[in-house]
Amino acid sequence: MKVVIVYSSRYGNGKKCVDCVDGALKARGHEVQVLNAPQSSPAQIPPADMYVFSGAAEAFGLAKGIKDYMNNMPELQGKKYALINTHGMSKPRGLPKMEKILSGKKKMVKVSEIHFQVGKEANTGNGLPAGYEAQLVQWVAGFA
């Protein structure tokens, strides 16, 4: 299966999640392409069997990089997607916003989601909880 991962990460927590998912997918024999949303053209999103989108919740919304990318990419009707959301709040407020764009406007089909509440070290890129890698590997095994 060909998987495209699109991410936006200000402090590096989301990038760590993406790197782990990239490795887990490749270990399962999948072809993976990783795109940094702010440095990529949404109009030229590569064709894939599945997409993974990763972004942080910031100020009760989505990080600008991933939000702009998803809003400006073409409709991918019927294509499967999974979501990764990092956030500093008690609830993953970014997931519903991501789903609204992808399932609503882009007519894609969600297959899975995962989120991590980052801790006090979030702005250093070390805010993820202990064991996040194992959780991500198990998460990937559930859909790939």
Sequence positions of predicted segments:
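FMN-binding flavodoxin-like domain, especially the glycine-rich phosphate-binding loop
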Residues: 16, 24-28, 33, 47-144
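N-terminal beta1-alpha1 ligand-phosphate binding loop
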Residues: 2-26
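Flexible, glycine-rich phosphate/dinucleotide-binding loops
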Residues: 12, 41, 90
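Short acidic loop-to-helix transition motifs that present clustered carboxylates
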Residues: 35-40
